[in-house]
Protein backbone atom coordinates (compact mmCIF):
# COMPACT_ATOMS: atom_id res chain seq x y z
CA UNK A 1 0.00 0.00 0.00
CA UNK A 2 1.27 3.48 -0.84
CA UNK A 3 2.31 5.57 2.14
CA UNK A 4 -0.21 8.23 3.11
CA UNK A 5 1.75 11.13 4.54
CA UNK A 6 0.22 12.73 7.58
CA UNK A 7 -0.02 16.39 6.75
CA UNK A 8 -0.89 19.46 8.75
CA UNK A 9 -0.23 22.55 6.66
CA UNK A 10 2.39 24.91 8.09
CA UNK A 11 0.54 27.85 6.60
CA UNK A 12 -3.14 26.84 6.56
CA UNK A 13 -5.28 28.84 4.20
CA UNK A 14 -8.65 30.34 5.08
CA UNK A 15 -11.34 30.00 2.42
CA UNK A 16 -14.43 32.20 2.49
CA UNK A 17 -17.46 30.48 1.03
CA UNK A 18 -21.22 30.65 0.64
CA UNK A 19 -23.94 28.02 0.68
CA UNK A 20 -25.04 26.74 -2.72
CA UNK A 21 -27.63 24.15 -1.69
CA UNK A 22 -28.60 21.75 1.09
CA UNK A 23 -30.24 18.33 1.27
CA UNK A 24 -31.01 15.65 3.83
CA UNK A 25 -28.75 12.73 2.95
CA UNK A 26 -30.32 10.42 5.53
CA UNK A 27 -32.42 10.78 8.70
CA UNK A 28 -29.31 11.68 10.73
CA UNK A 29 -27.23 13.58 8.18
CA UNK A 30 -27.71 17.02 6.59
CA UNK A 31 -25.46 17.97 3.66
CA UNK A 32 -24.49 21.55 2.90
CA UNK A 33 -22.74 22.26 -0.40
CA UNK A 34 -20.62 25.40 -0.51
CA UNK A 35 -18.55 27.32 -3.04
CA UNK A 36 -16.30 30.36 -3.06
CA UNK A 37 -14.00 32.38 -5.32
CA UNK A 38 -10.89 30.53 -4.12
CA UNK A 39 -12.37 27.13 -3.35
CA UNK A 40 -11.24 25.70 -6.68
CA UNK A 41 -7.75 25.89 -5.19
CA UNK A 42 -8.56 23.98 -2.00
CA UNK A 43 -5.60 21.57 -1.54
CA UNK A 44 -7.76 18.47 -1.20
CA UNK A 45 -5.87 15.29 -0.29
CA UNK A 46 -8.77 12.86 -0.08
CA UNK A 47 -8.92 10.45 2.86
CA UNK A 48 -10.13 12.24 6.04
CA UNK A 49 -9.21 15.77 4.94
CA UNK A 50 -10.62 18.10 7.59
CA UNK A 51 -10.98 21.78 8.32
CA UNK A 52 -12.11 24.31 10.91
CA UNK A 53 -15.55 25.62 10.06
CA UNK A 54 -16.37 29.23 10.98
CA UNK A 55 -19.99 30.38 11.14
CA UNK A 56 -21.24 33.88 11.75
CA UNK A 57 -23.47 34.47 14.74
CA UNK A 58 -27.23 34.86 14.15
CA UNK A 59 -27.21 38.60 14.91
CA UNK A 60 -24.27 39.40 12.60
CA UNK A 61 -24.55 40.89 9.13
CA UNK A 62 -20.97 39.92 8.21
CA UNK A 63 -18.69 37.04 9.14
CA UNK A 64 -15.69 38.25 11.14
CA UNK A 65 -12.59 36.04 10.92
CA UNK A 66 -9.28 36.03 12.84
CA UNK A 67 -6.32 37.72 11.15
CA UNK A 68 -3.20 35.59 11.46
CA UNK A 69 0.02 34.45 9.82
CA UNK A 70 1.49 30.96 9.71
CA UNK A 71 -0.53 28.48 11.75
CA UNK A 72 -1.13 30.67 14.81
CA UNK A 73 -4.84 31.34 14.39
CA UNK A 74 -6.16 30.38 17.84
CA UNK A 75 -5.05 33.42 19.85
CA UNK A 76 -6.24 35.90 17.18
CA UNK A 77 -9.54 34.01 17.20
CA UNK A 78 -9.87 34.34 20.99
CA UNK A 79 -8.98 38.03 20.70
CA UNK A 80 -12.21 38.68 18.80
CA UNK A 81 -14.85 39.98 21.25
CA UNK A 82 -17.14 37.16 22.30
CA UNK A 83 -20.25 38.77 20.84
CA UNK A 84 -18.50 38.99 17.44
CA UNK A 85 -16.46 35.77 17.54
CA UNK A 86 -17.68 33.23 14.96
CA UNK A 87 -18.67 29.74 16.00
CA UNK A 88 -15.83 27.31 15.24
CA UNK A 89 -16.08 23.52 14.83
CA UNK A 90 -14.13 20.73 13.13
CA UNK A 91 -15.51 18.91 10.08
CA UNK A 92 -14.32 16.52 7.39
CA UNK A 93 -14.70 17.09 3.67
CA UNK A 94 -17.57 14.84 2.59
CA UNK A 95 -16.75 15.40 -1.08
CA UNK A 96 -14.93 17.91 -3.26
CA UNK A 97 -15.34 18.86 -6.92
CA UNK A 98 -12.46 21.04 -8.03
CA UNK A 99 -13.85 21.96 -11.46
CA UNK A 100 -17.10 23.25 -9.95
CA UNK A 101 -15.27 24.69 -6.91
CA UNK A 102 -17.79 22.90 -4.68
CA UNK A 103 -17.27 21.23 -1.32
CA UNK A 104 -19.78 19.10 0.59
CA UNK A 105 -20.05 19.17 4.38
CA UNK A 106 -22.13 16.56 6.23
CA UNK A 107 -23.61 17.49 9.62
CA UNK A 108 -24.95 14.92 12.08
CA UNK A 109 -28.52 15.83 13.03
CA UNK A 110 -29.16 14.94 16.66
CA UNK A 111 -32.47 15.68 18.37
CA UNK A 112 -32.82 16.18 22.10
CA UNK A 113 -35.65 14.99 24.38
CA UNK A 114 -37.89 17.79 23.10
CA UNK A 115 -37.41 16.69 19.50
CA UNK A 116 -35.53 19.85 18.59
CA UNK A 117 -32.23 19.69 16.70
CA UNK A 118 -29.28 20.23 19.06
CA UNK A 119 -25.84 21.69 18.40
CA UNK A 120 -25.07 25.10 16.93
CA UNK A 121 -23.53 23.78 13.71
CA UNK A 122 -26.34 21.26 13.10
CA UNK A 123 -28.99 23.92 13.75
CA UNK A 124 -27.21 26.19 11.28
CA UNK A 125 -26.97 23.41 8.67
CA UNK A 126 -30.66 22.55 8.91
CA UNK A 127 -31.60 26.19 8.42
CA UNK A 128 -28.91 27.16 5.90
CA UNK A 129 -30.00 28.99 2.76
CA UNK A 130 -28.17 29.70 -0.52
CA UNK A 131 -25.89 32.69 -0.02
CA UNK A 132 -25.26 32.16 3.70
CA UNK A 133 -21.64 32.93 4.58
CA UNK A 134 -19.08 30.65 6.21
CA UNK A 135 -15.33 30.03 6.12
CA UNK A 136 -13.06 26.97 6.11
CA UNK A 137 -9.54 26.77 7.53
CA UNK A 138 -7.61 23.89 5.93
CA UNK A 139 -6.14 21.42 8.45
CA UNK A 140 -4.88 18.56 6.27
CA UNK A 141 -5.33 14.87 7.08
CA UNK A 142 -4.87 12.55 10.06
CA UNK A 143 -5.02 9.21 8.21
CA UNK A 144 -1.41 8.01 8.34
CA UNK A 145 -1.18 4.51 6.88
CA UNK A 146 2.40 3.15 6.59
CA UNK A 147 3.49 1.95 3.16
CA UNK A 148 3.97 -1.61 4.44
CA UNK A 149 0.57 -1.97 6.16
CA UNK A 150 -0.75 -5.49 5.68
CA UNK A 151 -4.33 -4.55 6.54
CA UNK A 152 -6.39 -1.52 7.51
CA UNK A 153 -8.97 -1.32 10.31
CA UNK A 154 -11.28 1.71 10.36
CA UNK A 155 -13.80 2.26 13.17
CA UNK A 156 -16.18 5.21 13.68
CA UNK A 157 -19.54 6.40 14.92
CA UNK A 158 -21.74 8.63 12.76
CA UNK A 159 -19.62 11.73 13.42
CA UNK A 160 -16.79 9.93 11.64
CA UNK A 161 -18.90 8.73 8.69
CA UNK A 162 -17.95 11.59 6.33
CA UNK A 163 -14.29 10.80 7.02
CA UNK A 164 -14.63 7.02 6.69
CA UNK A 165 -16.64 7.32 3.46
CA UNK A 166 -13.91 9.48 1.96
CA UNK A 167 -11.19 7.14 3.24
CA UNK A 168 -12.91 4.19 1.56
CA UNK A 169 -12.97 6.08 -1.75
CA UNK A 170 -9.30 7.04 -1.37
CA UNK A 171 -7.81 3.66 -0.44
CA UNK A 172 -5.80 1.85 -3.14
CA UNK A 173 -7.76 -0.85 -4.95
CA UNK A 174 -5.77 -3.72 -3.46
CA UNK A 175 -6.30 -2.69 0.18
CA UNK A 176 -7.57 -5.38 2.56
CA UNK A 177 -9.10 -4.85 5.99
CA UNK A 178 -12.34 -3.88 7.64
CA UNK A 179 -14.62 -0.94 8.37
CA UNK A 180 -16.84 -0.92 11.46
CA UNK A 181 -19.29 1.95 11.03
CA UNK A 182 -21.88 2.75 13.69
CA UNK A 183 -25.03 4.63 12.65
CA UNK A 184 -28.12 5.78 14.60
CA UNK A 185 -30.67 4.13 12.27
CA UNK A 186 -30.67 1.55 9.51
CA UNK A 187 -31.78 4.28 7.09
CA UNK A 188 -28.44 6.05 7.63
CA UNK A 189 -26.59 3.44 5.58
CA UNK A 190 -25.07 4.78 2.39
CA UNK A 191 -23.24 3.48 -0.65
CA UNK A 192 -19.52 3.20 0.08
CA UNK A 193 -16.95 2.82 -2.68
CA UNK A 194 -14.68 0.60 -0.60
CA UNK A 195 -12.01 -1.66 -2.11
CA UNK A 196 -13.24 -5.22 -2.66
CA UNK A 197 -10.88 -6.49 0.04
CA UNK A 198 -12.32 -4.26 2.78
CA UNK A 199 -15.22 -5.85 4.71
CA UNK A 200 -17.83 -3.24 5.65
CA UNK A 201 -19.87 -3.80 8.84
CA UNK A 202 -22.76 -1.43 9.56
CA UNK A 203 -23.64 -1.41 13.26
CA UNK A 204 -27.04 0.12 14.01
CA UNK A 205 -27.36 1.66 17.47
CA UNK A 206 -30.37 0.74 19.59
CA UNK A 207 -32.48 3.87 19.78
CA UNK A 208 -32.49 5.43 23.25
CA UNK A 209 -30.70 2.53 24.95
CA UNK A 210 -27.12 2.78 23.79
CA UNK A 211 -24.47 5.43 24.22
CA UNK A 212 -23.08 6.59 20.85
CA UNK A 213 -19.90 4.69 20.06
CA UNK A 214 -20.70 1.74 22.35
CA UNK A 215 -22.06 -0.47 19.57
CA UNK A 216 -19.00 0.08 17.37
CA UNK A 217 -16.72 -0.60 20.34
CA UNK A 218 -18.53 -3.87 21.11
CA UNK A 219 -18.13 -4.93 17.49
CA UNK A 220 -14.44 -4.03 17.53
CA UNK A 221 -13.91 -6.04 20.73
CA UNK A 222 -15.11 -9.12 18.87
CA UNK A 223 -11.86 -8.87 16.96
CA UNK A 224 -9.43 -11.34 18.55
CA UNK A 225 -6.35 -10.70 16.45
CA UNK A 226 -4.64 -7.76 14.81
CA UNK A 227 -1.68 -8.05 12.46
CA UNK A 228 1.25 -6.16 14.00
CA UNK A 229 2.10 -4.83 10.54
CA UNK A 230 -1.40 -3.44 10.01
CA UNK A 231 -2.82 0.04 10.60
CA UNK A 232 -5.93 1.31 12.39
CA UNK A 233 -7.94 4.53 12.34
CA UNK A 234 -10.48 4.93 15.18
CA UNK A 235 -12.55 8.12 15.52
CA UNK A 236 -15.80 9.39 16.99
CA UNK A 237 -17.03 9.57 20.57
CA UNK A 238 -14.08 9.96 22.95
CA UNK A 239 -14.44 6.61 24.71
CA UNK A 240 -14.76 4.75 21.42
CA UNK A 241 -11.50 6.32 20.25
CA UNK A 242 -9.49 5.70 23.43
CA UNK A 243 -10.87 2.24 24.29
CA UNK A 244 -10.71 1.18 20.65
CA UNK A 245 -7.04 2.09 20.55
CA UNK A 246 -6.43 0.24 23.82
CA UNK A 247 -8.08 -2.93 22.51
CA UNK A 248 -6.14 -2.91 19.25
CA UNK A 249 -2.88 -2.37 21.10
CA UNK A 250 -3.66 -5.30 23.40
CA UNK A 251 -4.11 -7.43 20.30
CA UNK A 252 -0.58 -6.56 19.24
CA UNK A 253 -0.94 -3.52 16.99
CA UNK A 254 1.83 -1.01 17.85
CA UNK A 255 0.59 2.36 19.11
CA UNK A 256 2.42 4.18 16.32
CA UNK A 257 0.25 2.28 13.84
CA UNK A 258 -3.00 3.49 15.39
CA UNK A 259 -4.50 6.90 14.64
CA UNK A 260 -7.29 7.78 17.08
CA UNK A 261 -9.24 10.95 17.70
CA UNK A 262 -12.13 11.78 20.00
CA UNK A 263 -14.38 14.03 17.93
CA UNK A 264 -16.73 14.62 20.86
CA UNK A 265 -17.56 13.40 24.38
CA UNK A 266 -20.90 12.00 25.48
CA UNK A 267 -22.17 14.03 28.41
CA UNK A 268 -23.94 11.31 30.37
CA UNK A 269 -21.74 8.24 30.51
CA UNK A 270 -18.81 6.41 28.95
CA UNK A 271 -19.26 4.13 25.96
CA UNK A 272 -17.10 1.40 27.49
Question: Regions from the language model: what does each represent?
Answer:
Residues 1-272:
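Extended, composition-driven regions rather than compact fold-specific motifs
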Amino acid sequence: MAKVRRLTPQHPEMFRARVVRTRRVSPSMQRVTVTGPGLGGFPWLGYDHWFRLFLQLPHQRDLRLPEFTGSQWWQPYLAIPEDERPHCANYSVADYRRTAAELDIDFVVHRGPSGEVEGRAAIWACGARPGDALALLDQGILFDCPHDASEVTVVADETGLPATASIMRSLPEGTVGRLIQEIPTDADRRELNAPAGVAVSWVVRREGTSVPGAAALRELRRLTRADASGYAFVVGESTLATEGRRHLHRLGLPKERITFSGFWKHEAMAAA
